[in-house]
Amino acid sequence: MSTQLVKIGTWGGNGGGRVDLSVLPRSLKSVTIRSGAAIDAIAFTYIGTDGKEHLAGPWGGGGGNPTTITLGSQEFVKGISGTFTNVVTNLKIVTNVTTYNFGQGGGTAFSLPLQSGSVVGFFGRAGALVDSIGVYVHI
């Protein structure tokens, strides 16, 4: 079965600088989020289309508390949701096992539940905080 990689999003503001991947993702291994009142930063490890492990980020600032999600061998991200103002204020990462919740929220809601496929990477805009976020999805 062949898969297709698509970019979906972004949700958030226009501040900060553009952040994206130089090697396209094939699978997501772990995600580290720094958060407090908002999403301060995101970093993640992934296996690229070149077959190698890559680290993206951290994108954003050094505030907030860091939390790392290490995906299990059979765990995958089946959706994201959250809220934003001019920055991302809340991010929920939904896997086939559990839901991880970051930031305090407020603003406009967004949601991307996937009926099939999985989130394999992120892109967006970042400066002192994560200004906007989008996802790479294998469908």
Swiss-Prot record:
SMART domains, per the entry: Jacalin (SM00915)
Keyword DNA-binding: no
SUPFAM superfamilies in the cross-refs: Mannose-binding lectins
Keyword terms, alphabetized: Lectin
Tissue specificity statement from the Swiss-Prot or TrEMBL entry: Expressed mainly in roots.
Keyword Heme: no
Ranges for domain Jacalin-type lectin: 5-139
GO molecular function, one term: carbohydrate binding
PANTHER family referenced in this protein's UniProt entry, alphabetically: OS05G0143600 PROTEIN (PTHR46506)
Protein name (database record): Protein GOS9
